[in-house]
Amino acid sequence: MSGLTAKTDSTPVKVHLKTKITIGEESDSFELVSFGRYYEKGDAVFLKYDEVQEEGTTHTIVKVTDSQALILRSGAIKMRMAFNESEEQNGSYESQLGTLLLTTKTKQLSHTQDESKLEGDFNLSYELKMQDSPVGDYVMSIHYKEEA
């Protein structure tokens, strides 16, 4: 996964998130730049960062292994989404109406990291359903780089 020695202490990173959502013929793109923490545990890489929006702050944790990913969000938005290229995964979204079932069908999942420095990319493409109804196609990329 990386040439870095496994460490449980975290490193400050700058996170650049890009998301493109396609629903039918319509597409929307969003970008976020945030500062967060990077750490490794076992065979997984973790990114922790906050998203500040009108609704409030959402704390996000992204966990990536060679073949799977998990995105956990808490705070203003509470969501759990799992990704695996070999099978659909169930997750959840908590709303005022209760907890809704999310299903992801991963089309592409990759993680690359420059072994000489703490800088990398996580790319994810997936179809999202909520309560078994299609929501849209998502393409997400996260670039992270150690803060000097």
Where are these regions (language model features)?
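N-terminal intrinsically disordered, cationic/polar leader segments
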Residues: 2-82, 86-123, 127, 133-135, ...
